[in-house]
From Swiss-Prot:
Disruption phenotype: No visible phenotype, but severe reductions in scopoletin and scopolin levels in the roots. Compromised iron uptake from an iron source of low bioavailability; this phenotype is partially rescued when grown alongside wild-type seedlings, presumably by secreted phenolics and flavins. Loss of fluorescent coumarins (including sideretin, scopolin, scopoletin, esculin, esculetin, and fraxetin) root secretion in response to iron deficiency. Impaired iron-uptake ability at elevated pH (e.g. Pathway: Phenylpropanoid metabolism. It catalyses: (E)-feruloyl-CoA + 2-oxoglutarate + O2 = (E)-6-hydroxyferuloyl-CoA + succinate + CO2; (E)-6-hydroxyferuloyl-CoA = scopoletin + CoA. Its EC number is 1.14.11.61. PANTHER family: OXOGLUTARATE/IRON-DEPENDENT DIOXYGENASE. The gene is F6'H1. Belongs to the iron/ascorbate-dependent oxidoreductase family. Keywords: Dioxygenase, Iron, Metal-binding, Oxidoreductase. This is Feruloyl CoA ortho-hydroxylase 1. One of its GO terms (molecular function) is dioxygenase activity. Induction: Up-regulated by 2,4-D treatment. Induced by iron deficiency, mainly in roots. Residues 204-312 form the Fe2OG dioxygenase domain. It comes from the Eukaryota. Binds 1 Fe(2+) ion per subunit.
Length: 361
């Protein structure tokens, strides 16, 4: 039998939705009311819940790559191999100062610990900029079952724009996180590009691979019935590359291309989790894989993560790169306007890998 909401604060599901979504309390606010059972709108269909027997059955693990290895060719080979076989890998000794990572994680907690009146200033209805958005779940109006996550989404336009519109309490730390990560991001994209016969990351390719940046500050509060819901549902990212900083709680799972199992990505202190996005899969004509992943809810700890989504410019047209199909390889994707692709992704609920079909020939 489905659990019911065991608190007198809400008399029906509509009141929960109003409290969480429209009044800006998020699931953090809901969790802090002391609810003892999961509201019905968060209960996922059975097939969307992650059953333990499908996790790590084969002791699979995504690759961990040491970027300080002096053999540059070896590092590049490991990155490209992981991009082809896993679509995910972790990097250590990446050159981003650890204090920068600690600072942005602390700033994430500070933002979500603000009074709801302060956070509400950044909801879709109240934000002074379309580049700043505080919200909950993924796409509440399109979802049959909501996800147990709150977020602050920050689309980087310029430091001046960020100074004007981003929340004071996390702005400087997030900008520093972006700036200190750029060298590593460029290095990874150069490796991936050279393997696609892209000789250099010139201005045109830079615009295509990393022309826009979005950062999310994600918050996954303690959940009363974590086995019945998800923090984030099955999906692949629409980015070229995603750079994920996670705390020590864990919960990220990746679908193995080899076995189909869900594989936990254990937190490694000071590391980043890197994953290929749909845009890179399309531009590589399917050589690099954007892979399904999801995040579990948990009943013991509040969790945060801070992904940087490295994207083409919205006005870019993405399709198989000329360098990839120059030798006669048949394109399996058509050219699409990147902003159209992103709009298609965000107007529906998470649905695994279906978004990339939008670009298939």
């Amino acid at each position: 039998m489905a659990p019911t909401l065991l608190t007198t604060q809400f008399s029906n599901p509509a009141e929960v939705t109003d409290f969480v979504v429209y009044k800006g309390n998020g699931v953090k606010g809901l969790s802090e009311t002391g609810i003892k059972a999961l509201p019905e709108q968060y209960i996922q269909p059975l097939e969307e819940r992650l059953i333990n027997k499908f996790v790590n059955e084969t002791d699979e693990a995504i690759p961990v790559i040491d970027m300080s290895n002096p053999d540059e060719d070896r590092v590049a080979e490991a990155v490209c191999d992981a991009a082809e076989k896993w679509g995910f890998f972790q990097v250590i000794n990446h050159g981003v100062p650890l204090e920068v990572l600690d600072d942005v994680k602390a700033a994430t907690h500070k933002f979500f610990n603000l009074p709801v009146e302060e956070k509400r200033k950044f909801t879709k209805e109240n934000s002074l900029s379309t580049t700043v958005r505080f919200g909950t779940s993924f796409s509440p109006l399109a979802e049959q079952a909501l996800e147990w996550k709150d977020y602050l989404s920050l689309f980087f336009v310029s430091e001046a724009e960020a100074e004007q519109f981003w929340p004071d309490i996390c702005r400087n730390e997030t900008l520093e996180y972006i700036n200190k990560s750029k060298k590593m991001v460029r290095r990874l994209l150069e490796y991936l590009g050279k393997n696609l016969n892209v000789k250099e990351l010139d201005e045109t390719k830079e615009s295509l691979f990393m022309g826009s940046i979005r950062v999310n500050l994600n918050y996954y509060p303690i959940c009363p019935n974590p086995d019945l819901t998800v923090g984030v549902g099955r999906h692949s990212d629409v980015s070229s590359l995603t750079i994920l900083l996670q705390d020590q709680i864990g919960g990220l799972h990746v679908r193995s291309l080899a076995s189909g199992n869900w594989v936990h990505v254990p937190p490694v202190a000071g590391s980043f989790v890197i994953n290929i996005g749909d845009a890179m899969q399309i531009m590589s004509n399917g050589l690099y894989k954007s892979v399904e992943h999801r995040v579990l809810a948990n009943g013991y700890n509040n969790r945060i993560s801070v992904p940087i989504f490295v994207n083409p410019k919205p006005e870019s047209v993405i399709g198989p790169l000329p360098e990839v199909i120059a030798n006669g390889e048949e394109p399996i994707y058509r050219d699409v306007l990147y902003s159209d692709y992103v709009k298609y992704f965000f107007r529906k609920a998470h649905d695994g890998k279906k978004t990339v079909d939008y670009a298939k020939i």
